[in-house]
Amino acid sequence: MASYEIVKGDLFTAQTSLAHCVSQDLRMGKGIATEFVKRWGRPKELYDQRYERLAVLKRQNEQGEWRYLYYMITKEKAWHKPSLKDFMKSLVHVLKHMIKNDVKHLSVPKLGAGLDGLSWDLIERALKKQFVEKHGINVTVYVL
């Protein structure tokens, strides 16, 4: 049975697939996105995918196992605020990619609830219902 848990700690200690929100311009100059840039840079393969709702990198974790890094494209420019509708469209793309690639665990910050200002309650409900309950995907939310 899949699980949903909230953990106090550093998202980047997770060895699972990770997701975070970005703008289509891929500026990634604030918030948790800056840490993604420090760790994985801005490879060309991200820019090649930026006109979709989702950009994905496949990278090895510290144990040498493959995992996905999901860059959820929720808005056009870094200074814009996403709508809940656009956020949810991107989240569905993450879910579809995970199902297609048999990914069973996703670790995230409080997606969309930080700088983007979306309702965490609505996002949390979607994660629990669609990922955990409906598709058996484990979700771990990291908070500081």
Identify the role of each PLM range.
Residues 1-144:
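Macrodomain-like recognition of ADP-ribose-binding/processing modules
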